[in-house]
């Protein structure tokens, strides 16, 4: 018997031992795991969510009693919506009530309807049982799954007992999903998501809910667990832009301390939303996420940065991961209704500014981008009094943006009558930032953001009496700057415009104003030569994400 056969037989025996422990039930793990004693009574120390506390719970406060009465009164409204789902499934009333909170006894049926689990069960009769049995026989990650199951929601009464009923169901779901979707297989945090479904859904329904959550375009959660990681890349870029726009001091401090390069705030947020905050707030946030879709991820991230702005600016470089996680935990240590009100306001604000993450669009011809976006929605007036021409055909890129230098804008010989600055076309995903505004010392966007249509959009065809604006060489910097020297613009404008108008329209940034911008440190860092990998490669290294992503 060779080494391969010996290793195979050892893995098979190990797999059988783990499966046998779960089949025996919670008594199989008592001597080894020193878990809770069987037949223990939890009558007086279990709260309304099912969390087991060490001491006996005090009587209900007036606020808690009011919350229970309010939840009971809302139950009839949710029952009416479920009875007439075709009318309410796309209504504003559903979203409003989701932010106010779903009643606990309605959450299971509502999650099932939102994720369309009944239809999946009808289309795939008996498939879950087949996938579960195959996973028991051939799972390659059963040890990791067993280890993660042992630490999932252990304070909840359903998962309190080691090798108990709910832990066995959770193991079966993860084994079945590993066989159902080999591309994802098993990744970290899937156990926490499946456990949340098991709190309110039967075993097979929870499995199909997990399948729908990871497969639907509305939620786009598979990108966090797939090997490609496209969702993580895009949301990380989107998050950097939104935080840089709303809290420039916070983002500038993080860039100066290199916190964003050492850990993924969005990945940290996703992990903490699962098991780092109270279960009640976690369920409320998941209610909103299932109703709103992936657009709710950015508002949640924005709130975390906004609340912790002062603390984040004081975060030192020592131990960034632990400090950053602790800041997020403190962010959500507040009233649930208050958090949801802030989340709703942030959602409206980002939607109004087109800062939420839109759903993916159809791939464009000639582009190999991982997630293309629709064409630009139009241009913006660059200076006061300038005219704007109708938009032309959108520009196309032959290769991914963040893996190569940006394309040069083609030269145009078409004059611009009247001396007006015209903005005809944009590269896909570059709407929102007029180029001359960057010369005033404002924040400048990265080409890494061009894949996303809510990123800043840089014009490529500014026709100023013939010549086009040139960009700085990307071999030195990955930030695009508009040339603002009068001697370069004067030959284009001297026929019809005096030099004073040129200076007032496109003034060069002064040294004093440029030093105050939070992005200067980033520009100097990216322009300076380094011995490590180039920061202008416009792709995120795997070390920037937490393990398992």
UniProtKB/Swiss-Prot annotation:
Protein's name according to its UniProt entry: TBC1 domain family member 3D
Segments passing through the bilayer: none
Keyword rRNA processing: no
Keyword flag Iron: no
Gene: TBC1D3D
InterPro entries: Rab-GAP-TBC_dom (IPR000195), Rab-GAP_TBC_sf (IPR035969), Rab_GAP_TBC_domain (IPR050302)
GO molecular function per UniProt: GTPase activator activity
Main localization (coarse): membrane
Domain Rab-GAP TBC: 101-293
UniProt xrefs under SUPFAM superfamilies: Ypt/Rab-GAP domain of gyp1p
Annotated spans, Disordered: 350-443, 507-526
Entry's localization field: Cell membrane
Post-translational note: Ubiquitinated by a CUL7-based E3 ligase, which leads to proteasomal degradation. Palmitoylation is required for membrane localization and protects TBC1D3 from ubiquitination.
Biological function: Acts as a GTPase activating protein for RAB5. Does not act on RAB4 or RAB11.
Organism: Homo sapiens (Human)
Covalent lipid sites (S-palmitoyl cysteine): 318, 325
